Amino acid sequence: MQPTDPNKFTDKAWEVIVKSQDIVRAYQQQQLDVEHLILALIEDPTSLAVRILGRAEIDPIRLQQQLEAFTQRQTKVGKSDQLYLGRSLDVMLDRAEEIRERMKDGYISVEHMLLAFVDDERVGRKVLKGFNVDSAKIEASIKAVRGSQKVTDQNPESRYEALQKFGRDLTEQAKSGKLDPVIGRDDEIRRVIQVLSRRSKNNPVLIGEPGVGKTAIAEALAQRIVNGDVPESLKNRQLISLDIGSLIAGAKYRGEFEDRLKAVLREVTESNGNIVLFIDELHTVVGTGSNQQGAMDAGNLLKPMLARGELRCIGATTLDEFRKFIEKDAALERRFQQVYVDQPSVENTISILRGLKERYEVHHNVKISDSALVAAATLSARYIADRFLPDKAIDLVDEAAAQLKMEITSKPADLEAIDRRLMQLEMEKLSLAGEEKVAAPTKERLQRIELEITNLTEKQQDLNNQWQGEKQVLEAISLLKKEEDALRVQIEQAERAYDLNKAAQLKYGKLEGVQRDREAKEAKLLELQSQGSTLLREQVTEADIAEIVAKWTGIPVNRLLESERQKLLQLESHLHQRVIGQQEAVEAVSAAIRRARAGMKDPNRPIGSFLFMGPTGVGKTELARALAQFLFDADDALVRLDMSEYMEKHSVSRLVGAPPGYVGYEEGGQLSEAVRRHPYSVVLLDEVEKAHPDVFNILLQVLDDGRITDSQGRTVDFRNTVIVMTSNIGSEHILDVSGDDTQYETMRNRVMDALRSHFRPEFLNRVDDTILFHALSRSEMSHIIRIQLKRVESLLRDQKISFEISPAACDFLVEKGYDPVYGARPLKRAIQREIENPLATKILENTFISGDTIYIDQDENGLSFTNKAPVKVSVTQITT
């Protein structure tokens, strides 16, 4: 039979014939024969031919080597474009055609060629003689791969062993110990088993947020099936996870995807209930395939089988995707029984982490302390709001362990410091030795360098040996742990197979020996650690977890682990370094923060919400900045919104984002996006009385529930923010009684009346505290001038110019800048006018240059600037 018509062959078979011609040319031969065709057939290790040979217990690599040796012995003619068909290949292809007819297939396929090769007298029988196979054995393995399917089109290979190709056997992975242990979730697993045991519509769908453990429930079921801890209807069943992605991948032509899916479903049906399918991301099934013209929706292929109970299927999807894709298709939805999977509590998460601890220790070759597991659960629940337990806690432990492993395998910091110092000394030595005339001091320096190099080299050698020794002990412990883990899996497999003799040998022989070796190595490591001279640490601690949380969220790690009591006791003194006066305001803010941190308020509300009332320039915004710097170690943790920008009704939507269909919908809101990206910040709503009344409807949610929902349906968490609103309402009443304490209550009542007349009661009722800021006195202004002058001092320091000022000059500036109506802002303008402007002119005129000391004093014309101070008083020494 001449292989000239590709329509008689399947695509893969014709591809093999074309490829065999390249092999002939590579061997510089002219006759295309059986050996070239079979070499092309088994060249791809994932091909159908290799799978068939594997089932027949034929090693394809050994077969390839024998065929290559046979081909090498054939006649070579050099390079030739013209090829001839060998007689034995012609006979083999005729035999393949006969086999096709006998098997009632439509096209000559790879398996027909392979079966014909077994009976080939020239090559086949000779090569296969050593493998102890015959055509019956090959035919049996073909039947095992093909099942009951016929070759009805030119791409039948995609339908063979469809489940093996497009699925992952979870029960097989459970047998070999590749699945992580699943702790808890008993109610959900029992509900899944209950639904699977029904006569019809026996298809549970696991619905829950991402990361709560839906896939883990399917893996737990696989482990229970393997252990026999299931009802009779599920015993000895296979749980196979279907990969929709690989099912779609490469399906180029119309109907090709449906063919693959039908092949999978046929295998499941033919198993007579022995196979349970698990479809992760179930929503991907709906609409899959229907994008091709005339193609069917994969969901529609599943519906009849799901309803009749022929297909037992477990689905898993998130709440949003279930609503978006599956609820729309009511016919598909009613065939699934919903099993809701909630986020576990912190206590349950700790139990889950304890169950997984050993797996992560073996993988990373580190130890994980129990306090680290508790910290991972509690800190992730408190600080990582946009993800779910237990996934976020597991990720924390995994990353902390990976970081520690990286430290173990990297060179220790002490050793790196010695390496760098040695390099510096070597360079200095070369530089000094290169001088033509070496002076006596230089010789002494060279001798000192050589002595230091000798000492450091010895120390480097000792530290290097110690590091390598510790590393070897840790690696040995890791290998023994892995061996111990593998032995435990073998013991479980032996016990399941009732091979109690083998189980006893492994448990009381090998396992005990490995455990003794591991304990000896751990004792050696403990001895090294007890001497206090270890370079490497091998335990993940609470501090490591906190450091990872800090990297994820931006909270400084030292703040996270600092004693809460000590931190809160320092709050007033820290705020007073930046905010002068306003004792009542500082104390009120500090008290509210203390209440929140001591757990004496609702954890579902913001840390604190304050309404700062008072005239302009008295420190309302500065207190918010100081609070941000103290709580979050950065001024940029302040999210500042000028509420005068939200005076019109249409601008209110900018806070949480434009509604769908409007310009800017994709961009999100200015308030919601700022807090979503920086969930740990002080939110300052400046001049809040200028905002449109509708703004306060949004703020009600924030102040009461600690969260808002933006225009895209995302929940933004405000529980870890401090909300500060400033207002000038009633400031005229505060100015009227400045410095008079007797009228304070009257003034406060007037301000509160003004406040109540402007803001609605439900808004004021949700604010933690309304704080009145007093007008600044002269003595307070004297303190503020010192803070303001430090800014000038830092500007001059950049130009290497010193700056000193007399107390009289300070008093002059206070006099010029004091205005109780405008607060501290005129003081800044006075400094700019009286100091910065003249200094700028004098620096440009070169009156003062780098290295000078400027002394500022008062004279009859105002302020004088001289280069040499008669009495030097620095800014920090100014007294009021």
Curated annotation (Swiss-Prot):
Residues 564-775 are annotated as: NBD2. Residues 776-880 are annotated as: C-terminal. The keyword Endoplasmic reticulum does not apply. Residues 161-343 are annotated as: NBD1. Residues 344-554 are annotated as: Linker. Gene3D superfamilies: 1.10.8.60, Clp, N-terminal domain, P-loop containing nucleotide triphosphate hydrolases. ATP 1 binds at G208, E209, P210, G211, V212, G213, K214, T215. It holds the Pfam family ClpB_D2-small. Keywords: ATP-binding, Chaperone, Coiled coil, Cytoplasm, Nucleotide-binding, Repeat, Stress response. Residues 394-530 form a coiled coil. One of its GO terms (cellular component) is cytoplasm. Residues 9-74 are annotated as: Repeat 1. The keyword Hydrolase does not apply. Residues 85-148 are annotated as: Repeat 2. It is found in: Cytoplasm. InterPro entries: AAA+_ATPase, ATPase_AAA_core, Chaperonin_ClpB, Clp_ATPase_C, Clp_N_dom_sf, Clp_R_dom, ClpA/B, ClpA/B_CS1. GO terms for molecular function: ATP binding; ATP hydrolysis activity. Residues 6-148 form the Clp R domain. NCBIfam families: chaperone_ClpB. The Clp repeat (R) domain probably functions as a substrate-discriminating domain, recruiting aggregated proteins to the ClpB hexamer and/or stabilizing bound proteins. The NBD2 domain is responsible for oligomerization, whereas the NBD1 domain stabilizes the hexamer probably in an ATP-dependent manner. The movement of the coiled-coil domain is essential for ClpB ability to rescue proteins from an aggregated state, probably by pulling apart large aggregated proteins, which are bound between the coiled-coils motifs of adjacent ClpB subunits in the functional hexamer. Belongs to the ClpA/ClpB family. This is Chaperone protein ClpB 1. It comes from Nostoc sp. (strain PCC 7120 / SAG 25.82 / UTEX 2576). The gene is clpB1.
